[in-house]
């Protein structure tokens, strides 16, 4: 698949277009231009390194939303075997914006749950663009209870702009469904490992992200509101989204520095969409390391550790001001 370049990547896009043109010409040319292709390829790689080393929070937000970025089901196919999807909340409907089911990770049985946005227009509409309704969160809770019953570790993958704010969703108890999941996940008697793989949008993300370990891919985001939403409220204009992204502190490195997440999983050069398999390999290692940390831990110790982790959020330190 041809890479889609973002607006701020246009210098890279122009170089890649030249390289592609030269490769096309080389097929029918008697002149060897392989050295020129190699020179431009190295230049493109260095330009990508330089650009990605100084990304703004707004640019990171754009990468997190990239249309070719791997979604939950892409990681399921790369990281897990014997995946068997489970459907429905047993109360109202099956919300396709959240997927989940039984699987094996490195040979160990587990439960996998995550947001799913969809690739084309038809699938995006069917999956509500990755914005869950209450039945999606209740399905997730049902699968978590199954995992708890059989002592299976839970892996969750977060990638949503937020919970769906429609009238029907509110009528069916959207806030209650989210709040109930927070309560349930805090008390579950089995390990939970959450990874933000794209957008981590507010309560819609948090409802499957209360965990023993929370990780973020390098170019994912996690925030109480989208930059556009924040800009519309504070400045009455979505055009201020870059400033809002800076103020929100939504990048993985900022959140790690604040102690709100536990680990950052690096992405290949140019982001996960450039090398999905390479990203999956890095994520597999991180998930395996996290899971080993909890193997053999008693239920009481696991829950106590989770409680202490949650209670550590929002701590502050008093200092004596100098005159």
From Swiss-Prot:
Keywords, ordered alphabetically: ATP-binding, Cytoplasm, Fatty acid biosynthesis, Fatty acid metabolism, Ligase, Lipid biosynthesis, Lipid metabolism, Nucleotide-binding, Transferase
Localization terms from the record: Cytoplasm
Domain of life: Bacteria
Tagged with keyword Ligase: yes
Keyword Cell membrane: no
InterPro entries: Acetyl_CoA_COase_a_su, ClpP/crotonase-like_dom_sf, COA_CT_C
Entry EC no(s): 2.1.3.15
GO cellular component, one term: acetyl-CoA carboxylase complex
Catalyzed reaction equations: N(6)-carboxybiotinyl-L-lysyl-[protein] + acetyl-CoA = N(6)-biotinyl-L-lysyl-[protein] + malonyl-CoA
Pathway, per record: Lipid metabolism; malonyl-CoA biosynthesis; malonyl-CoA from acetyl-CoA: step 1/1
Family: Belongs to the AccA family.
Function: Component of the acetyl coenzyme A carboxylase (ACC) complex. First, biotin carboxylase catalyzes the carboxylation of biotin on its carrier protein (BCCP) and then the CO(2) group is transferred by the carboxyltransferase to acetyl-CoA to form malonyl-CoA.
Name this polypeptide is given: Acetyl-coenzyme A carboxylase carboxyl transferase subunit alpha 1
Organism: Burkholderia thailandensis (strain ATCC 700388 / DSM 13276 / CCUG 48851 / CIP 106301 / E264)
């Amino acid at each position: 698949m041809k890479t889609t370049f973002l607006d701020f990547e246009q210098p890279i896009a122009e170089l890649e277009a030249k390289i592609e043109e030269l490769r096309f010409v080389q097929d029918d040319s008697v002149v060897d231009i392989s050295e020129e292709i190699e020179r431009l390829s190295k230049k493109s790689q260095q330009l990508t390194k330089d650009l990605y080393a100084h990304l703004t929070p707004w640019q990171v937000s754009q990468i997190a939303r990239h249309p070719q970025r791997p979604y939950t089901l892409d990681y399921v196919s790369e990281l897990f075997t014997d995946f068997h999807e489970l459907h429905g909340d047993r109360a109202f409907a099956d919300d396709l914006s959240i997927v989940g089911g039984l699987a094996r990770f490195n040979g160990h049985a587990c439960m996998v749950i995550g947001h799913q946005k969809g690739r084309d227009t038809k699938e995006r509409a069917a999956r509500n663009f990755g914005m869950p309704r209450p039945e999606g969160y209740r399905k997730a809770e049902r699968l978590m209870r199954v995992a708890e019953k059989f002592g299976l570790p839970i892996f969750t993958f977060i990638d949503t702009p937020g919970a769906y704010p429609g009238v029907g969703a509110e009528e069916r108890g959207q806030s209650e469904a989210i709040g109930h999941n927070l309560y349930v996940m805090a008390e579950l008697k089995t390990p939970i490992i959450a990874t933000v793989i794209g957008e981590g949008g507010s309560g819609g993300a948090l409802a499957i992200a209360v965990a023993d370990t929370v990780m973020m891919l390098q170019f994912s985001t996690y925030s109480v509101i989208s930059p556009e939403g924040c800009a519309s409220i504070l400045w009455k204009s979505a055009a201020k989204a870059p400033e809002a992204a800076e103020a929100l502190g939504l990048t993985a490195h900022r959140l790690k520095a604040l102690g709100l997440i536990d680990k950052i999983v690096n992405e290949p050069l140019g982001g996960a969409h450039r090398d999905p398999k390479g990203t999956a390999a890095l994520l597999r290692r991180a998930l395996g390391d996290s899971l080993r940390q909890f193997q053999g831990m008693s239920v009481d110790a696991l829950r106590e550790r989770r409680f202490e982790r949650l209670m550590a959020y929002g701590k502050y330190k008093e200092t004596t001001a100098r005159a």
